[in-house]
Amino acid sequence: MNRSAPSAIAVPGALCLAFLLVACGPPASSPSTTSPAATATSTTTSTTTATKTASASASAETEAGWKSYTTADRLMFDYPADWKITDPAGEAAPGGVFVNITNANGKKLATLRTNMVTGSECTEKQPFGVYESVPVPALQQKGNVPRFTFETRTDTAATDSKLMTLFAYGITSAPEPGGTEACPMFHFFTWPPSGAMFGGVYDPFDATPGNEMHVDTPEAYMGTQEYKSIKKMVTSLRPVA
């Protein structure tokens, strides 16, 4: 497994987020070689359901400085008490949720979406780096345990160094990549009735007030309290008993 980080810098967060939502997936059994880049779709399920009511609620603090949040479709995660939950943050898939989490200064840290259906083809692999990968056993499905990962992909064809490398963290059901190249990031995980995502992007160019000083590499970011809290929040995701 390639765990060394590419030397290129990261793409801005908005482009990273679009990449996470619609641009990637696990390799098809017979990937095409005629297209210069991976293609994918991300659509909501067509199952008809009643309009979701505002049933999501925050519970009492789980530990000092932290709270728990339960979504309308009965998933729960813990988060720092001074962070903000926006639910809904946009149009959710039928029967699913669309939740954004921001810090006290309004910096977007993660998105949780459920009841999503994805499809893709891996037509071109890219150099990659894996900074962290840990299992999330609470989300196990039929013996398959997804994992939280913080990783990167490098587009060697990019002419702008700022657009060369994508940094992102989230939960994935995709196998951990090996060798020197990998398919584009697939930060989705299997969850009934289809799939879900919970993660975000690292942008060293982000200038939100309150950011820690001199943090401009993924290695440095991993040492910040922000990243540690994001990881704790994302890996705390579990179904409500």
Range-by-range predicted roles:
Residues 2-13:
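Bacterial N-terminal signal peptides that target proteins for export
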Residues 6-7, 20-54:
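Bacterial lipoprotein signal-peptidase II cleavage site
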Residues 12-21:
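Bacterial N-terminal signal peptides
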Residues 32-33, 129-134, 190-194:
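Extracellular/mature segments of secreted proteins
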Residues 42-75:
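N-terminal low-complexity, Pro/Thr/Ser-rich intrinsically disordered segments
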Residues 72-162, 167-169:
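Secretory pathway targeting signatures of secreted, lumenal, and periplasmic proteins
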Residues 153-241:
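Short, well-structured beta-strand
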